[in-house]
């Protein structure tokens, strides 16, 4: 019935580009399980990922008292807070608020009360380690074959 309505509406507008069937991917995040990441206190639901480009859109759930270690953004990062709040040296972002990070910006992020955020990455973050070296890393799910440690990534 819905397909008939779409086809009928298209026929009424000559010159209109026809939609690509199967060109959209619909998800029900509420039915997806939270997966652990390599960062204690942070779990993830991946909504979209292009591993070749390094792009990712995901929900991240921060437990109260969580800190994401110092890292740099090689591309802009966009974040919308759905629940709770998180903060860094530049300010605090609360439920219903949005923040984006400039290319090359570095920060450590904290959440005292916990948070659920929608994050959009164009490239994986680069994490700085106390030993003074830098490795590219991205948020990954822990699996039996990948215990979730931060390691070099291609790209």
Feature map (PLM): residue ranges:
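Residue-level marker of beta-strand positions
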Residues: 67, 97-98, 116
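Ligand-binding loop in jelly-roll beta-barrel domains
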Residues: 103-130
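Conserved hydrophobic/aromatic beta-strand scaffold that supports enzyme active sites
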Residues: 44-46, 57-59, 78, 98-100, ...
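A short, N-terminal "cap"/entry segment at the start of jelly-roll beta-barrel domains
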Residues: 1-54, 135-155
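Short histidine-centered beta-strand/loop micro-motifs
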Residues: 48, 58-60, 69-73, 90-91, ...
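Short acidic-glycine-tyrosine-enriched beta hairpin
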Residues: 87-111
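Short, charged/polar surface micro-motifs in flexible loops or helix N-caps
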Residues: 52-54, 63-67, 87, 105, ...
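Glycine- and acidic-residue-biased ligand/ion/polar-headgroup-sensing regions
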Residues: 63-66, 72-89, 95
